[in-house]
């Protein structure tokens, strides 16, 4: 550059004193001096004001005493001397192109980023955002599948038309299985049998294997096929019945002539033992009470009767006790202690809680009703119900499927029911029809009831002590019975004490003579106290104890206040 502009070239080494002095003189003559300091990595321009002296402007451009001219000044030093960093934007780069600032090469930035990860974001000014991925679903178009082409007049075409029309096609071999696709139908036809499936228990024939499995589970309780000499294990049988009960909600009797169904395993097993047997066989199965001879057809009924009526004493001798009652022996403990009344009440409440837990486990199951003995059915009479033909029943069932309700067929009656059984019960008591039904009658007290639920509630509440089953309705009657027994025992104790007192008064000894003089008040109090102590002591003794003869009794004279005189 020319000396007229006052530009001073930056030298790598220290400048001599004369050269520095000449530059100061040239810079003082110019109104505005432009000073450029070059370095290997940075370049900037310093503007000067006219008010500043030449010495001050020159001192800002020249290097410090021993440091080279290419020394890079700090930003704090530039701010203190009113040097703007934006002035560097007017300086041309090494290639002659003006740039805002010289950036570091890529290699140095990578090294800085390794040491300081946040530095890279500061250099670029903002974080790098991930590129938005295009949605593949938006680009792809939905291609509608063309209907498969089948030969004209073929079976596949007929099946396809039937699927389009009805939604499914049935198997031409068994006519019991339907499929929604032709591939599924072909796969089924490979395994489909033309022969019918036959039930091994009742001989009924069905077309599908699934129908046969349901038939065996519903009608035969999934009874396995037994060979000659094989027996059913009791735990496995209970597990099998439990699975059937969970799936269907009830257990049906397997006899063809019996249509009974049960909602508990215990009730079902109790029914199976007696179903189909004659009166003679049932008579042999009865269990009679050893004390009163009352017959019971279940162990639980006899056990409850013995606990409530005869107490926890042994009801059979050791040698004559039958095998069926050995497992429920109610003898006293090894110590010989008889069960207390409070323990009996506790056992009763425990049984009540256990029955409540069973009812919670299966809400629809009538556990207590299944345990009722057979003679309970004879405690009340049922009136005759009207009979209906199969056509009428089929019509009612179809009406329920269509309209979900049935109306009473009698003229003038607007009763509506959602089940056939409800309509049957209503027709037995409907007064607008031609059928005249009787009433339910209790055989224990000859009381009549309109509904079956009424007579059952009456038997459970009034005649509850006759049953071994503990129902929630019998709780109050049982508590009353226990209170009455407790009062009777207390009255008997009072009567015994009264009798003992009367006997003591009669047994007063005639040899005791009272003094002629009237005793003082203190003597009378002592006599009364001694007399009361004597009564209490005798009342504590057993009333059956024999009285002591008078000749062995010691005669005690009453105490007096008179002092013995000297003879």
Swiss-Prot record:
Pfam families: zf-C2H2, ZNF512_C2HC, ZNF512_zf-C2H2. It is found in: Nucleus. There is a cross-link at residues 18, 84, 227, 333 (Glycyl lysine isopeptide (Lys-Gly) (interchain with G-Cter in SUMO2)). Keywords: DNA-binding, Isopeptide bond, Metal-binding, Nucleus, Repeat, Transcription, Transcription regulation, Ubl conjugation, Zinc, Zinc-finger. Its main location: nucleus. A zinc finger (C2H2-type) spans 197-220, 287-310, 406-430, 440-463. InterPro entries: Krueppel_C2H2_Zn-finger (IPR052274), ZNF512_C2HC (IPR048408), ZNF512_znf-C2H2 (IPR048403), Znf_C2H2_sf (IPR036236), Znf_C2H2_type (IPR013087). Residues 119-130, 495-508, 556-567 have a biased composition (Basic residues). Residues 1-34, 87-148, 485-567 are annotated as: Disordered. Residues 485-494, 523-544 have a biased composition (Basic and acidic residues). One of its GO terms (cellular component) is nucleus. GO terms for molecular function: DNA binding; zinc ion binding. Belongs to the krueppel C2H2-type zinc-finger protein family. May be involved in transcriptional regulation. This is Zinc finger protein 512.
């Amino acid at each position: 550059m020319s000396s007229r502009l006052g530009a001073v070239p930056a030298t790598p080494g220290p400048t001599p004193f004369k050269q520095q002095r000449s530059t100061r003189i040239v810079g003082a003559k110019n109104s505005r001096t432009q000073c450029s300091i070059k370095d290997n990595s940075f370049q900037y321009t310093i503007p000067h004001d006219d008010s500043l002296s030449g010495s001050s402007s020159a001192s800002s451009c020249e290097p410090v005493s021993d440091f080279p001219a290419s020394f890079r000044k700090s930003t704090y030093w530039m701010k203190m001397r009113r040097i703007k960093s934006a002035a560097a934007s007017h300086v041309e780069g090494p290639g002659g192109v003006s740039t805002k600032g010289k950036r570091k090469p890529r290699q140095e930035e990578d090294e800085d980023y390794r040491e300081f990860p946040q530095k890279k974001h500061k250099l670029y000014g903002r974080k790098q955002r991930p590129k938005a991925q295009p949605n593949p679903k938006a680009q792809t178009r939905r291609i509608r599948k063309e209907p498969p082409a089948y030969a004209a007049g073929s079976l596949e075409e007929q099946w396809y038309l039937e699927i389009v029309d009805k939604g499914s096609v049935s198997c031409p071999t068994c006519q019991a299985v339907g499929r929604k696709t032709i591939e599924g139908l072909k796969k089924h036809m490979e395994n489909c049998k033309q022969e019918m499936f036959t039930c091994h228990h009742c001989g009924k024939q069905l077309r599908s294997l699934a129908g046969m499995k349901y038939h065996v589970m519903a009608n035969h309780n999934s009874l396995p096929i037994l060979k000659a000499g094989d027996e059913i294990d009791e735990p496995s049988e209970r597990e099998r019945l439990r699975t059937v009960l969970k799936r269907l909600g009830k257990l049906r009797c397997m006899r063809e002539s019996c249509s009974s169904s049960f909602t508990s395993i215990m009730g079902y097993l109790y029914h199976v033992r007696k179903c189909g047997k004659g009166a003679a066989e049932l008579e042999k199965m009865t269990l009679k009470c050893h004390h009163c001879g009352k017959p019971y057809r279940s162990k639980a009924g006899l056990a409850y009767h013995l606990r409530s009526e005869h107490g926890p004493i042994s009801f059979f001798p050791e040698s004559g006790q039958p095998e069926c009652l050995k497992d429920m022996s109610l003898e006293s403990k090894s110590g010989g202690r008889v069960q207390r009344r409070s323990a009996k009440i506790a056992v009763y409440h425990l049984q009540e809680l256990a029955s409540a837990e069973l009812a919670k486990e299966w809400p629809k199951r009538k556990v207590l009703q299944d345990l009722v003995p057979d003679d309970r059915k004879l405690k009340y009479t049922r009136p005759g119900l009207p009979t209906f033909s199969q056509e009428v029943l089929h019509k009612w069932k179809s009406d329920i499927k269509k309209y979900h309700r049935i109306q009473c067929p009698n003229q003038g009656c607007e009763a509506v029911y959602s089940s056939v059984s409800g309509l049957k019960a209503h027709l037995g008591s409907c007064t607008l029809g031609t059928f005249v039904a009787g009433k339910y009658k209790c055989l224990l007290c000859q009381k009549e009831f309109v509904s079956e639920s009424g007579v059952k509630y009456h038997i459970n509440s009034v005649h509850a002590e006759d049953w071994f089953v503990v129902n929630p309705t019998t709780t109050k009657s049982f508590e009353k019975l226990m209170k009455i027994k407790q009062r009777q025992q207390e009255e008997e104790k009072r009567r015994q004490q009264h009798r003992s007192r009367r006997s003591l008064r009669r047994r007063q000894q005639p040899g005791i003579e009272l003094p002629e003089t009237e005793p003082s008040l203190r003597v009378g109090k002592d006599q009364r106290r001694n007399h009361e102590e004597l009564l209490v002591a005798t009342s504590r003794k057993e009333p059956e104890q024999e009285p002591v003869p008078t000749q062995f009794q010691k005669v005690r004279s009453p105490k007096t206040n008179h002092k013995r005189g000297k003879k």
